[in-house]
Amino acid sequence: CFLFQPIGLDAGLGTVINGELVQGNYHLAGEVKFLPMQLSDDKANLNKTPEGIVELVSKMLITISSIIAPEVFIIYSDMVDDVNVIKNKIEDVFASEVEDFNIEIYKVEHLQEYILAGLMLLCAK
């Protein structure tokens, strides 16, 4: 799963299963802004601080993990410095249920490379 969390805006999630992008009915797959979450503050306020972004991203990824349990998350967000903080929050939730639970999370620093690669793949189809 690839999570794009821009500053001050709603996140989006792209999920690839068996080599195919999941679009869902009405192309709603990945519209994580509709996830019901218990948050410490309004999403609009959380979306403006590094701590708030970590809370939002962690809770989104916990929800996604409980639904489809992806092997890997890839995150793009200018406000996330250390993905290990998010990784630890997710692992804490599942550790009591799943022995040796471990999730891989990577941070993308430069989004342009992935945009170009995605466009090239679309053109090749």
Residue ranges and their predicted role:
Residues 1-39:
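Phosphate-binding/catalytic loop of phosphoryl-transfer enzymes
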Residues 21, 39-125:
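ATP-binding/phosphotransfer module of carbohydrate and carboxylate kinases, centering on a glycine-rich
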